[in-house]
């Protein structure tokens, strides 16, 4: 019963709280990826698009031979606006990518720090105790890093628990939409 005492000493909520931390990191990562893919619509881009549409609409309305020069001028103006929009979008996408990459690196760094803290706090301490029949072929893998054995039970270590939690949270996050 020394394993149960170890779990009581460290807190019986260690496994669920660790899982929640892993799920939160997965959700934040997915949210950041979706924001990066979606991008952001802003007023400058929408203004340029409406101006281009308006100029092309006016140019197509002028189909008389007498108004050909004016229609050509409107089309050239629309073409310059399209070039301006393309340059603006390129610059805007670079800025967005840079900022999201910075947030992604910050998220990764905080994930690594939190995982290291969890490993240091729970090294050689079981996170959970599971009946040996439930995890028959994987018992030794799950008990890696716990430093002890119990008859009839498998003590789950922090590193296998983090790996398992990470895989399960990735699966769960596939069904979450933002």
From Swiss-Prot:
Predominant cellular place of this UniProt entry's protein: endoplasmic reticulum
Phenotype upon loss of function: Strong reduction of root hair length.
Ranges of the Lumenal topological domain: 1-11, 132-143
Membrane-side (Cytoplasmic) residue stretches: 33-110, 165-178
TM region positions: 12-32, 111-131, 144-164
Biological process terms in GO annotation: root hair elongation; tail-anchored membrane protein insertion into ER membrane
Localisation: Endoplasmic reticulum membrane
Gene Ontology cellular-component annotations: endoplasmic reticulum membrane; GET complex
UniProt record similarity statement: Belongs to the WRB/GET1 family.
Its biological purpose: Required for the post-translational delivery of tail-anchored (TA) proteins to the endoplasmic reticulum. Acts as a membrane receptor for soluble GET3, which recognizes and selectively binds the transmembrane domain of TA proteins in the cytosol. Involved in the control of root hair growth through the regulation of syntaxin SYP123 expression.
Name of the molecule in the record: Protein GET1
Source organism per UniProt: Arabidopsis thaliana (Mouse-ear cress)
Gene name as annotated: GET1
């Amino acid at each position: 019963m020394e394993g149960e005492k170890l779990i009581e000493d460290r807190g019986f909520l260690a496994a669920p709280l660790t899982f929640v931390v892993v799920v939160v990191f997965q959700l934040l990562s997915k949210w950041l990826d979706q924001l990066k893919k979606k991008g952001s619509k802003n007023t400058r881009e929408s203004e340029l698009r409406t101006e281009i549409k308006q100029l092309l609409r006016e140019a197509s309305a002028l189909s008389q031979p007498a108004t050909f020069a004016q229609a050509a001028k409107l089309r050239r103006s629309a073409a310059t606006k399209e070039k301006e929009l393309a340059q603006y979008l390129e610059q805007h996408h670079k800025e967005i990518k840079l900022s999201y990459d910075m947030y992604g690196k910050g998220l990764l760094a905080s994930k690594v720090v939190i995982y290291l803290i969890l490993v240091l706090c729970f090294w050689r301490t079981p996170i959970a105790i599971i009946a040996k029949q439930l995890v028959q072929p994987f018992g030794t893998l799950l008990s890696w890093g716990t430093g002890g054995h119990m008859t009839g039970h498998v003590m789950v270590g922090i590193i296998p628990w983090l790996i398992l939690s990470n895989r399960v949270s990735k699966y769960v996050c596939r069904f979450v939409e933002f």
